[in-house]
């Protein structure tokens, strides 16, 4: 009789526990499930609910212990294996999470969430072909699942199969017309395919559906650096960009660019942003002027960081580095590099130095394909700086990325004589080929050249430069009268750099 009483009481508690979990009362669910597992340590369901409650309450490590206990008590519970996979995924233990999701699918082949999460895991592990298979299996099970088509599209894009990726996003949108993420992913893919007009249509739809989505506003500002929309596209980002460009053209002058000119241009631009109440920021610190060549710098740096080798491309890459001394000089240099006429329209940028291992603060860079070209451009830049900025700046020619000489000191040697010039190690070729097989995306992008003229993206970046200038204590920064710090992260990093690289 006593046993039946206890059993009846436990069933009542379990029903209450399930209700607490289903209604989102996780603190109470945690408390009750702890009580049950203490009194009934082999109650598998109580351990499973305890794990879910602990996870929701931010106790991820304790949650892991509880779900492992649940799996141990009932190894054939597919849901317990799935929950264990989710927790391991959150803990970034991806290999173990993969095993759990595969076990879930083995126990329950139509467990759609497990196929989806397995796809995510495989994508992160860069096993893209396997990720594709997982998403395709999910679509077999749920052909009308818009998220599955979107996720497959992301994987196909990373595989460099842009047309198939586009088809997946369009299918997702047909199933869920107001699917913001799919519209945005489609826009990004269309930009990479060079179809800017169509990309603009999708960004317009994203902003219509979610007007204040930060990343989409940033994406659109980036698109407008190389695309002029027709009159049918009218939203605050487009309007602000147009007004900034018009003001720049009005203020454009020949000869020395005065401090007052820079201050006026910046203040006019920020006033336009305020006029349209545009809440937009960027974390970028680099303002580019791009031609149609894909330098693939992100790829090269990943190869260097992962394998400690210098990619072959970088042995023929040189740059002219210009070093302004104040924030005002940096903005002036941006204008000079915007207006400069070069035979190859070389890629160039202005930036603030954020890399902890690299010295310096303000920089302008012009990328060149050989040493002779670099020296010619360096001489030309010296003349332009004198004529348009009126101050002397340090101008040097360097080879490749600044990180390379730290690992390979001989790489920084620059001379026309082949005797001392470090050469590419042919043993590295196979490593690069293997990497590119696994990472086919970046080299297939179509790069659209940047339009001339100051734009919204430039102003957002200049705001970040000002935060940086405050961090390093640049005395000229107060002239720009930016009271708000838009990027606390950039400001803090700049303060840290000041102590390390303060000019001697």
State what each model feature region is.
Residues 326-327, 368-375:
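Helix N-cap motif at beta-to-alpha junctions
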Residues 9-39, 49-52, 56:
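Alpha-helical segment of the N-proximal tetratricopeptide repeat
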Residues 14, 18, 45-56, 67, ...:
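Conserved alpha-helical positions within TPR/SEL1-like repeat arrays
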Residues 192-194, 211-334, 349-351, 414-504:
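Charge-rich, low-complexity segments
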């Amino acid at each position: 009789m006593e046993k039946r009483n206890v059993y009846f009481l436990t069933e009542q508690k379990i029903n209450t526990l399930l209700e607490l979990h289903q209604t989102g009362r996780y603190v109470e669910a945690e408390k009750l499930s702890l009580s049950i597992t203490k009194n009934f340590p082999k109650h598998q369901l109580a351990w499973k609910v305890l794990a879910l409650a602990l996870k929701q309450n931010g106790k991820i490590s304790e949650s892991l212990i509880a779900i492992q206990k649940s799996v141990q008590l009932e190894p054939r519970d597919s849901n317990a294996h799935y929950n264990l996979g989710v927790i391991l995924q959150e803990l970034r233990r991806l290999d173990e999470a993969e095993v759990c999701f595969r076990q879930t699918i083995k126990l329950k082949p139509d467990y759609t969430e497990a196929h989806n999460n397995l796809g995510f895991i495989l994508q992160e592990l860069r096993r893209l072909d396997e990720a594709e298979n997982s998403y395709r299996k999910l679509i077999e099970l749920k052909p009308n699942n818009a998220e599955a088509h979107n996720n497959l599209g992301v994987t196909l894009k990373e595989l460099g199969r842009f047309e198939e990726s586009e088809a997946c996003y369009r299918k997702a949108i047909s199933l869920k017309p107001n699917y913001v993420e799919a519209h945005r992913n489609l826009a990004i893919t269309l930009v990479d395919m060079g179809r800017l007009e169509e990309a603009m249509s999708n960004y317009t739809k994203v902003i219509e559906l979610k007007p204040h989505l930060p990343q989409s506003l940033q994406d659109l500002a980036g698109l407008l650096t190389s695309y002029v929309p027709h009159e049918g596209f009218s939203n605050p980002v487009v309007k602000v960009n147009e007004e900034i460009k018009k003001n720049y053209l009005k203020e454009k002058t020949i000869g020395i660019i005065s401090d007052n000119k820079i201050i006026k241009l910046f203040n006019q631009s920020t006033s336009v942003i305020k006029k349209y109440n545009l809440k937009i920021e960027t974390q970028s610190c680099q303002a580019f002027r791009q031609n149609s060549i894909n330098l693939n710098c992100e790829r090269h740096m990943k190869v260097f960081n992962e394998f400690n080798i210098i990619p072959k491309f970088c042995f023929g890459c040189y740059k002219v580095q210009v070093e302004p001394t104040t924030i005002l000089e940096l903005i002036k240099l941006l204008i000079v590099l915007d207006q400069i006429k070069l035979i190859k329209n070389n890629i160039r940028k202005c930036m603030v130095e954020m890399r902890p291992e690299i010295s310096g603060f303000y920089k302008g860079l012009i990328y060149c394909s050989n040493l002779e070209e670099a020296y010619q451009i360096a001489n030309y830049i010296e003349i332009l700086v004198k004529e348009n900025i009126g101050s002397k700046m340090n101008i040097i020619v360097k080879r490749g990325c600044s990180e390379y000489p730290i690992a390979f000191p001989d790489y920084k040697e620059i001379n026309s004589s082949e005797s001392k010039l470090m050469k590419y190690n042919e043993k590295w070729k196979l490593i690069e080929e293997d990497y590119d097989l696994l990472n086919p995306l970046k080299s297939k992008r179509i790069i659209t050249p940047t339009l001339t003229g100051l734009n919204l993206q430039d102003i957002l970046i200049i705001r970040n430069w000002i935060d940086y200038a405050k961090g390093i204590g640049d005395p000229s920064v107060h002239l720009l009268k930016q009271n708000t710090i838009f990027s606390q992260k950039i400001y803090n990093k700049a303060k840290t750099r000041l102590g390390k690289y303060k000019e001697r």
